[in-house]
Amino acid sequence: MAPYHIRKYQDSDHRSVVDLFRRGMEEHIPATFRHMLLLPRTLLLLLGVPLTLFLASGSWLLVLLSILTLFLSLWFLAKYTWEKHVMNCLHTDMADITRTYLSSHSSCFWVAESRGQTVGMVAARPVKDPLLQKKQLQLLHLSVSLQHRREGLGKAMVRTVLQFAQMQGFSEVVLSTSMLQYAALALYQGMGFQKTGETFYTYLSRLRKSPMINLKYSLTSREGDL
């Protein structure tokens, strides 16, 4: 296991952070494709459309082309989902990471470095909701390089956020992650995060039945555990 060091983000990290974030999101395209492929409505289309075309035309070529078109459409939708998420982040909070996360003592952005390479990242900022009864910190953009998985780095990055939240006087750490991010969900729940609900942020996510899972870690009930 290669040694790593977790530190605050610097402007010189921007390109490597963006590359790491983009690669991490693109890893979920195959899982999203498989999830959509196994939906009942998709299976119905894969059976119904080719069968209808064959009965109407008797052409196996049309059948094969229709199946290929359906598969390509599903792959495009899966790819579009994650590419859109990346572009949205790069044009909002990650457009200027220093200004968004390092201009206030209550937010931060960390990178994990190993042998001069950026191999992990995570961010945190306060939840701005006047109706909240408790002070919440939102965990965002956790990503670990594929070559450094299963080394405890993901847990170390999350623990960094939890310790920061405790030091800044937050009561809870919250986050949202796609149900398709299986490894991330297992990591969070294994560290004590509790599911609080599900949210469909887009029509496409509702159509493919893949909600965002909302999770919460209560710091007030775990004092001394960190």
Curated annotation (Swiss-Prot):
Keywords (A to Z) from UniProt? Acyltransferase, Cytoplasm, Membrane, Nucleus, Transferase, Transmembrane, Transmembrane helix
Cysteine pairs forming cystine bridges in this chain are none
Enzyme class, top EC level, equals: transferase
Q: Which GO terms describe its molecular function?
A: histone H4 acetyltransferase activity; N-acetyltransferase activity
Query: Where does this one sit in the cell?
Result: Nucleus membrane; Cytoplasm, Perinuclear region; Cytoplasm
- Name where it mostly resides: nucleus
Which topology term describes how it sits in the membrane? Multi-pass membrane protein
Q: Tell me which domain of life the UniProt entry assigns to the organism this sequence originates from.
A: Eukaryota
**Can the keyword Acyltransferase be found in this entry's annotation?**
yes
TM segment ranges: 36-56, 58-78
Tell whether Nucleus is among the UniProt keywords: yes
Taken from the UniProt entry, a GO cellular component term is: Golgi apparatus
A Gene Ontology biological process in which this protein takes part is:
gastrulation with mouth forming second
EC number(s) in its UniProt entry?
Answer: 2.3.1.48
Q: Which residues form the N-acetyltransferase domain?
A: 61-220
Catalytic reaction list: L-lysyl-[protein] + acetyl-CoA = N(6)-acetyl-L-lysyl-[protein] + CoA + H(+)
Q: What does this protein do?
A: Has histone acetyltransferase activity in vitro, with specificity for histone H4.
Q: Which family does it belong to?
A: Belongs to the camello family.
Recorded protein name is: N-acetyltransferase family 8 member 3
Please tell me the species this chain comes from: Mus musculus
